[in-house]
Structures are given as C-alpha cells and as structure tokens.
Amino acid sequence: SENTGAIGKVFPRGNHWAVGHLM
C-alpha cells in the first residue's frame, strides 16, 4: 500500500494505469 502512495507522487492521477500495472 505504501508503494502505491509513492507512485502517486511520481505519476499524476492521469497515469492511473501505472498503479494497476504494479498492483
């Protein structure tokens, strides 16, 4: 879960695809 937050800072919400790829 913490990793998701870190990625949210690096990638804007527009890149929500990145979050799904990691998860």
UniProtKB/Swiss-Prot annotation:
Write out the GO cellular component annotations: cell body; cell body fiber; extracellular space; secretory granule lumen
InterPro entries on file: Bombesin (IPR000874)
Q: Does the keyword Nucleotide-binding apply?
A: no
Residues bearing the modification Methionine amide:
M23
Is the keyword Secreted in the record?
yes
**Predominant cellular place of this UniProt entry's protein:** secreted
- What Pfam families has UniProt attached to this entry? Bombesin (PF02044)
* Keyword annotations of the record: Amidation, Cytoplasmic vesicle, Secreted
What is this protein for, i.e. what is its function?
A: Stimulates the release of gastrin and other gastrointestinal hormones.
Sorted alphabetically, the Gene Ontology BP terms of this entry are:
neuropeptide signaling pathway; positive regulation of peptide hormone secretion; positive regulation of phospholipase C-activating G protein-coupled receptor signaling pathway
Q: What is this protein called?
A: Gastrin-releasing peptide
| Similarity comment | Belongs to the bombesin/neuromedin-B/ranatensin family.
| PROSITE patterns documented for this protein | BOMBESIN (PS00257)
- Protein's cellular compartments: Secreted; Cytoplasmic vesicle, Secretory vesicle lumen
